[in-house]
Amino acid sequence: MSSEQLHEPAELLSEETKNMHRALVTLIEELEAVDWYQQRADACSEPGLHDVLIHNKNEEVEHAMMTLEWIRRRSPVFDAHMRTYLFTERPILELEEEDTGSSSSVAASPTSAPSHGSLGIGSLRQEGKED
């Protein structure tokens, strides 16, 4: 998995960033394990082994949630988004529109594209800089 490795030299990163990276990689690994155990359980025809695999999957879910909570406690951005989107039954895109004041469906609409053929993301060139 590409995210296991640091993308910048470790000596340039704060301990906070390195610890967050460890937590994010751990979360990815736990979620991947959930998927693997579920697939194994689905494919398993022996009831006893099936039950063990489901038990193991549920343990991985617990580990993932513990890690996610650690991340939430240390990241105001994660905390804010989790408070917006989790533990509600309202439509997710409705929550997003309310939170950001914009609608994703409008942004994806073909009629909202600029008429000049641009993707609407602006120039990537820096002002005053020639190639």
From Swiss-Prot:
Annotated spans, Disordered: 96-131
Keyword Oxidoreductase listed: yes
Amino-acid positions noted as binding Fe cation 2 in the UniProt annotation, renumbered to this chain: E30, E60, H63
Region described as Targeting peptide: spans on this chain: 98-131
E.C. code: 1.16.3.1
Activity regulation details: The ferroxidase activity is inhibited by zinc.
Protein name: Encapsulated ferritin-like protein
